[in-house]
Amino acid sequence: MLDRRGSYEYEDLLACGRGELFGPGNAQLPLPPMLMFDRIVEISETGGEFGKGVVRAELDVKPDLWFFGCHFKNDPVMPGCLGLDAMWQMVGFFLGWTGGAGRGRALGLGDLKFSGQVLPTASKVVYNVDIKRVMRSKLVLGIADGWLSMDGDIIYRAKDLKVGLFKQGAAPS
């Protein structure tokens, strides 16, 4: 049975990472430490900039987050690729949430701009993805634009995030 709530808490995200939310062989989130948000505060098939869906998630920033200790010594900053990965994770979650079958894989993006950095002094990161298109054929493909804000200021913008859901053995190499 598909779980179609409008928001998800941390324990729900962990259940998704264990393959319990969308069924065996379907979209999963990574488990910690690669799970890059603490909750999904909004998910809808009708909202967003393009009217085709939106996902909004939050990460509570704490100075002891795993990446601050190694990136970089005496100059801690969240790696930009982790913020990007969070947006791909959200597109994959959306595809599973809408009933798409298969295992999720990030397939690329059109453009990415950083205008700031996430520091351990921040309190909250908000991620947003606006779904532009979902195609359902041999694979399920989602395309979205996204942004990341730190304490209210948008500091990452991504265009044309692409995520596919692939049946067992069909994922790109």
Curated annotation (Swiss-Prot):
GO terms for cellular component: cytoplasm. Pathway: Lipid metabolism; fatty acid biosynthesis. Its main location: cytoplasm. It catalyses: a (3R)-hydroxyacyl-[ACP] = a (2E)-enoyl-[ACP] + H2O; (3R)-hydroxydecanoyl-[ACP] = (2E)-decenoyl-[ACP] + H2O; (2E)-decenoyl-[ACP] = (3Z)-decenoyl-[ACP]. InterPro entries: FabA, FabA_FabZ, HotDog_dom_sf. It is found in: Cytoplasm. Its EC number is 4.2.1.59, 5.3.3.14. It comes from the Bacteria. GO terms for biological process: unsaturated fatty acid biosynthetic process. The keyword Lipid metabolism applies. Pfam families: FabA (PF07977). The active site is at H71. The keyword Isomerase applies. Keywords: Cytoplasm, Fatty acid biosynthesis, Fatty acid metabolism, Isomerase, Lipid biosynthesis, Lipid metabolism, Lyase. GO terms for molecular function: (3R)-hydroxyacyl-[acyl-carrier-protein] dehydratase activity; trans-2-decenoyl-acyl-carrier-protein isomerase activity. Homodimer. Belongs to the thioester dehydratase family. FabA subfamily. Necessary for the introduction of cis unsaturation into fatty acids. Catalyzes the dehydration of (3R)-3-hydroxydecanoyl-ACP to E-(2)-decenoyl-ACP and then its isomerization to Z-(3)-decenoyl-ACP. Can catalyze the dehydratase reaction for beta-hydroxyacyl-ACPs with saturated chain lengths up to 16:0, being most active on intermediate chain length. This is 3-hydroxydecanoyl-[acyl-carrier-protein] dehydratase. It comes from Bradyrhizobium sp. (strain ORS 278). The gene is fabA.
